[in-house]
Amino acid sequence: MKKKYPILSLLFFISIGVFSQGNANDKDTSSKKPEPPKDRNMFGLHIPRGLKVNSPDVTDGYVLFAVPNSASFYLVNRRGEVVHEWKGNYAVLGGYLQNDGSIIQNAVDPDFPVFAGGGEAGRIQKISWDSKMQWDFEYANEEYLHHHDFAVMPNGHILAIAWEDKTAQEVVMAGRKPNMIPKAGLWPDKIVEIEPDGARGGKIVWEWHIWDHLIQDYDTKKMNYGKPADHPELLDFNVGDTVPPMISQDSMDVLHKQGRAWRNQTPENEGSEVYHFNAIKYNADLDQIVFSSPNLSEIFIIDHSTTTKEAAGHKGGRSGKGGDFLYRWGNPQNYHHGDSTDEKLFGQHDIRWIEKGKPGEGHLTVFDNDIPNAAHMPYSAVYELSPPVDTKGNYFLEKNGTFGPEKPVWVYMAPDTLSFWGSFVSGAQRMA
């Protein structure tokens, strides 16, 4: 369902949505297909298909989106007509249209092992306008897996989110509480920069691991012991949920047969997927990366101007802070400030900087999916944030020890709240 507003276009598909305003030949190049049903059953809600709003105020351009569980990407015009289709070889999650008409997308590797938790990908591909595979890079094995989202940098490199496997013993040594450690260990997130090489190759030229930026106040004997309230630049390793009681293998088998379990989900890895990074963007002017963790109800900014060695530490780079968080927003409880009334984000997706030349350029927008509502069902909102910076452009803490702002500079939500809700995924982009 797509809704159009004077300064914001919202894509509200159950898929990862991306937008394009590039030039395209306004001609349907897709083959004729049978007419689909008039509505689609989404969680018991029968949502009408097709174009919903097309007002005179619509912004010129096209909309690009992927179809869940298919290998196709579509470009549609503002009349809802298909302009072009790119066809890949695996189920696609999301992607970005390039100036040459190609798509860079992430797709689900058919054989990825170990990991489970939603958003699994494992492959990043470049597909030409005429659907020829130009690059097919696999980042999936028993030690790591690319998932959810990636960003295309101006130099053609790719910044990709990935899980990495840590054994239960490694997690114990990092100071996590025993009741928060699954038998299979944990899968903390990392970010890798990939330089494409040939038709299938890629070189990792930079990387950042959240594992290197943990703090905990549980075990005084561990190297990362400290007070999280004094170090908002680090992540409290004991924030999160305790491990649920382990179910039997028979029960897990039933869940798999019912389609209610992820492909590699086992009784032993329940709770292994902890932070669930689900969106990433790059700002070339700042040389900074922003990413989202709905499990933490926070968005984070880190410095990309570091070397990989500096990114693993607390010094270096343009900021002088290495790979530590430069900024975070959404839930100050995670660094022991405030209470539940200070939580701003609930299962959010699609963090991004507003582009140059558009209202609010340099600000951030985020889609807040699942805002609690005691009187009715949850609802969604889009926030525009202006992170406070000093005269040198450095993010700073407010007097109460938290990162601002206290409130977004702009908010969109439905007047009745109920008519605007995306239970997961979803996104927003400032258009004009």
What positions do the PLM features span?
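Bacterial Sec-dependent N-terminal signal peptides
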Residues: 1-25
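Histidine-/acidic-rich catalytic cores in large beta-rich domains
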Residues: 21-432
